[in-house]
Amino acid sequence: MSKSNQKIASIEQLSNNEGIISALAFDQRGALKRMMAKHQTEEPTVAQIEQLKVLVAEELTQYASSILLDPEYGLPASDARNKDCGLLLAYEKTGYDVNAKGRLPDCLVEWSAKRLKEQGANAVKFLLYYDVDDAEEINIQKKAYIERIGSECVAEDIPFFLEVLTYDDNIPDNGSVEFAKVKPRKVNEAMKLFSEPRFNVDVLKVEVPVNMKYVEGFAEGEVVYTKEEAAQHFKDQDASTHLPYIYLSAGVSAELFQETLKFAHEAGAKFNGVLCGRATWSGAVQVYIEQGEDAAREWLRTTGFKNIDDLNKVLKDTATSWKQRK
């Protein structure tokens, strides 16, 4: 991994003293609006969304090495973060066009890597939906798109964090048994691809390679993977890249995410941290809407703190320094 001194210094600002990225993800936009809409009849307002992000930043960033925010609703929160907390800013538009095939990527049109850097970002994050089994006419567009962003980040000398979410258009439910069977290959092959130097990715933000709800010992119903098979998928994931990689929480509970990290570590995965979002703060949404700012702050200081503190303890025992991979 040949990174510039500036990129290395920037990633250091995003990680803790042990070289582990213990980052808080709150760049949700569409998903957050849907969460909020469950608890109120009117459309969530810009002020509501911005204020909730500010609350989370004020209360939890002292316990995180960095925070991932979006430049659409998250800039007030970026100003409210702890002075020692690094900043990643998202570059992609939220969601994808459900009417078009391929889940093609799209940048926020009024932003660039240069502008995100000027806004104070220590890194640019971009989310890509990718299916290694999709038609090449779709995937070549995605590869070219990531090459552009990678080149932009090289030009601005700012780290590029690529988040890859896998899918299969033929399997609408990615929580299904059918998707669980194909997920390991899709996750690990995508990681392998985007580790190629041509993409100039510095850190991969990825899914765990299995659906833990179908792993023997974790499953309540059908088992798709034995513990040994699941462990092998984590080993294969680690071998699929030379780049630092961190796990996303994918909306699972705090407890399951922590158990997953322990399992990954025991399997031999030398992951370098997390970008954990909903598993840490999701419970604050309902409290904020139904009981107001003070109650949400109290939730963040108690349950939210416990979630992030427990996660940090697990990371201390399970994650390895990204510097071992460079």
Curated annotation (Swiss-Prot):
Question: Which EC number(s) does UniProt give?
Answer: 4.1.2.40
Entries under InterPro entries matching the protein: Aldolase_TIM, DeoC/FbaB/LacD_aldolase, LacD_aldolase, Tag_1.6-dipho_adolase
Known pathway: Carbohydrate metabolism; D-tagatose 6-phosphate degradation; D-glyceraldehyde 3-phosphate and glycerone phosphate from D-tagatose 6-phosphate: step 2/2
**Record carries keyword Iron:** no
Give the EC class as a word.
lyase
Q: Name one GO molecular function term.
A: tagatose-6-phosphate kinase activity
Identify the Pfam families for this entry.
DeoC (PF01791)
Q: Name the reaction it catalyses.
A: D-tagatofuranose 1,6-bisphosphate = D-glyceraldehyde 3-phosphate + dihydroxyacetone phosphate
The UniProt entry's GO biological process terms, in alphabetical order, are:
6-sulfoquinovose(1-) catabolic process; D-tagatose 6-phosphate catabolic process; lactose catabolic process via tagatose-6-phosphate
Keyword Nucleus recorded: no
Keywords tagged on the record: Lactose metabolism, Lyase
Q: Which family does it belong to?
A: Belongs to the aldolase LacD family.
Its recorded name reads Tagatose 1,6-diphosphate aldolase
Give the organism, scientific name.
Answer: Staphylococcus aureus (strain MRSA252)
